[in-house]
Design a protein with these regions (language model features):
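Catalytic cofactor-binding cores of redox enzymes
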Residues: 1-213
Length: 213
């Protein structure tokens, strides 16, 4: 396979694959390792982040909220109970913003070297999205998906159980961006479907490897 997730599942014995994926041999994608649905079968302790908040407020807005609450702390109990958490929010927002900017810089470099006009335009769109989100509120469907992916992937990288991140009610927090883009002529249904497919392909690459004694 072209990614670790595909190679990992294909390397499993057939009996092991069907233990996880079930006896339905018509489920070729799951059984052969072509794709692994994210947050479906891995663990019972799944949860969903507040993706709507990162899409609508951005890291800058969340950071400002945390800083305001830090400034307002005046009780000794809150210094112990709340201050470390709020400081962690500020650090996390800064780290996530820095991480996204690195992707923006990389996409810009790749676009400068790209000779294919279509791919060059795609890379420029990726660079523009990564330069804006998740630091700032999402303005388009593409930016909303990009911000959502940064948020969930940051959690996946931070801890092992981050692999069980649920997507939550995507229909609710993504629809306003989709509707606005379609109404204003920036997006077609086919383009939105392709962007969602790209998101799912990225999620399928998140495969856990657990060592056994």
């Amino acid at each position: 396979g072209k990614d670790f997730g595909t190679s990992f599942v294909r390397a499993l014995p057939e009996a092991t694959r069907f233990y996880f994926f079930g006896p339905d041999r018509s489920n070729v994608a799951m059984a052969t390792g072509v794709g692994i649905c994210s947050a479906v079968w891995r663990h019972s302790q799944n949860w969903a982040h507040d993706f709507a908040k990162i899409l609508n407020k951005g890291c800058a807005g969340i950071r400002a909220e945390a800083e305001a609450r830090l400034t307002a702390i005046d009780e000794p109990f809150d210094v112990v109970e709340k201050k470390p958490f709020l400081e962690a929010i500020v650090i996390t927002c800064d780290a996530l913003t820095t991480w996204a900017r690195r992707y923006a810089a990389l996409a810009t470099e790749m676009a400068a070297r790209e000779s294919n006009p279509q791919r060059k335009r795609e890379l420029e769109e990726i660079a523009a999205a990564c330069a804006h989100v998740p630091e700032h509120p999402s303005r388009t469907f593409r930016e909303a998906l990009q911000a959502q992916w940064f948020a969930q992937m940051f959690s996946r990288l931070e801890q092992n159980i981050g692999g069980q991140v649920s997507q939550g009610r995507m229909d609710q927090y993504l629809y306003p961006f989709y509707r606005k883009d379609v109404e204003e002529g920036r997006l077609t249904k086919a383009e939105a479907e392709e962007l969602l497919q790209c998101l799912w392909l990225n999620m399928m690459q998140s495969t856990e490897v657990k060592m056994s004694p």
